Amino acid sequence: MATASVAFKSREDHRKQIELEEARKAGLAPAEVDEDGKEINPHIPQYMSSAPWYLNSEKPSLKHQRKWKSDPNYTKSWYDRGAKIFQAEKYRKGACQNCGAMTHTAKACMDRPRKIGAKYTNMNIAPDEKIESFELDYDGKRDRWNGYDPSTYHRVIDLYEAKEDARKKYLKEQQLKKLEEKNNNEKGDDANSDGEEDEDDLRVDEAKVDESRQMDFAKVEKRVRTTGGGSTGTVRNLRIREDTAKYLLNLDVNSAHYDPKTRSMREDPLPDADPNDKFYLGDNQYRNSGQALEFKQLNIHSWEAFDKGQDMHMQAAPSQAELLYKSFQVAKEKLKSQTKDTIMDKYGNAATEDEIPMELLLGQSERQVEYDRAGRIIKGQEVILPKSKYEEDVHANNHTSVWGSYWKDHQWGYKCCQQIIRNSYCTGSAGIEAAEAALDLMKANIARKEATEESPKKVEEKRMASWGTDIPEDLELNEEALANALKKEDLSRREEKDERKRKYNVKYNNDVTPEEMEAYRMKRVHHEDPMKDFL
């Protein structure tokens, strides 16, 4: 068990140690220094910064985390390809039976198999190969480019350049050939049109030949290799990550503290430098700028919506939360604009150049305005031409004239069919003839009825009673009997409300006197009477 060799501490000392570590992490206290005078990052966990017990380390240090084993003398050299060391003149015992070299056997020989080997001919003895042995480290064994000679790639470049020169030469020959054909073929309009087409072809070929005349946005300035390997791009279209990391801007140990766990540097690493020349001002500078505020507002909105019962969570469904927040912002802006428009429509806009009415400035006006029964202004403002309150030049339901073009018996109608019912279907001249026939028939019936009657009956004159009923004029009522009838009517109505008080052997008198009839008429509720609630 690798534990740190620390002495026993009391509860108070342990609390102070914890507070000191928290202050070091927050940057309020200076960092701990090891035995070599180097600062120890306070964010390193204790199980990594504490030395094992068997090292007997009394001072804080990180030497136990560093590599203490010395590496062997690894080399990055590679085999000398095709190198020869010694060439014998005659066959040697143990050499290759095919070529005569001592460095390999006949089974591993890479030369052409001879019809009669060098062992028997003792001629054309091959030289011995240079045998090398390297001690490679872990990375050297897996380096796929180890031993590669970059100078050999010039042959590939020369091959592509030769192909490009041949292509340009061929295009130039084609261009000269078309120019000769153009000079030899000058025949009228057809020749002119052909010449224009040839000029277009020449322009295209010229663009292919001369790459220096390409557009500025497609100009190839420099070829760079991307991190993925194999793909290339232009300097204009490809961003090269040559910017310096923020923890390397200031190598002073007392400068802004960098937290490797969260990759944050809250303070400005170069506080004395020109702000125009700096691209990084510290994390605190960007916490309240850019999209950081939008993200903060999004979190606050998701919390408030969740507290109000909305199924919205920023960590569980971030896309849904962002979509709901955007819809909320749109609805909020729409409501705000509607409120603004409503207020401006009601009170006006003081920023406009329109003259403010006197009614709004003084609260009153001396201008006299007169209206007609239809609510139209007839006097008091600018002169208004008389205009019909009905829609003009609108012919509905097959009519050929507008409503109000016909007048009869104090009623408006349609002139085309003489109908006085609005929105009725037009019957034309047939409807006019039918109406006239019905009118003639009605007049004939009235005349026939008057002729058959010998003497008209006298209409009995009636007068309205006080409560709206018709009674004969010669009717005489007894005032005392009328008062008794009114009392009796009130008593009967009270008994009707509660029939349980009616006696079993009650007797009714069905004879109605004129006074009782008048009392009934006086007590009866008239629903059409506007004063019935005050009786």
Curated annotation (Swiss-Prot):
Origin superkingdom: Eukaryota
Residues covered by region (Disordered): 21-44, 176-204, 489-508
Subcellular location: Nucleus
Keywords attached to this entry: Metal-binding, mRNA processing, mRNA splicing, Nucleus, Phosphoprotein, Spliceosome, Zinc, Zinc-finger
GO BP annotations listed: mRNA splicing, via spliceosome; positive regulation of cell population proliferation; RNA splicing
Gene Ontology MF annotations: pre-mRNA 3'-splice site binding; single-stranded RNA binding; zinc ion binding
Coiled-coil stretches: none
Phenotype upon gene inactivation: Reduced organ size due to lower cell number and reduced fertility. Cell proliferation is arrested precociously in organ primordia. Altered expression of splicing factors required for the transcription of the cell proliferation gene STRUWWELPETER (SWP) and for the timing of cell cycle arrest in leaves. Double mutants smp1-1 smp2-1 are not viable at the gametophytic and/or embryo stage.
Presence of the UniProt keyword Zinc in the record: yes
Summary of the tissues where the protein is detected: Mainly expressed in tissues undergoing cell proliferation, particularly in lateral organs.
InterPro entries: Slu7_dom, Splicing_factor_SLU7
CC terms in the record's Gene Ontology section: spliceosomal complex
Zinc finger (CCHC-type): 96-109
Segments passing through the bilayer: none
Pfam families: Slu7 (PF11708)
Modified residues (Phosphoserine): 193
Acidic residues bias locations: 191-203
Basic and acidic residues: compositionally biased ranges: 176-190, 489-501
Motif (Nuclear localization signal): 486-493
Primary role: Participates in the second catalytic step of pre-mRNA splicing, when the free hydroxyl group of exon I attacks the 3'-splice site to generate spliced mRNA and the excised lariat intron. Together with SMP2, involved in the timing of cell cycle arrest during leaf development, in a STRUWWELPETER (SWP) dependent manner; promotes cell proliferation in developing organs.
Family recorded in the similarity comment: Belongs to the SLU7 family.
Name this protein carries in UniProt: Pre-mRNA-splicing factor SLU7-A
Organism expressing this protein natively: Arabidopsis thaliana (Mouse-ear cress)
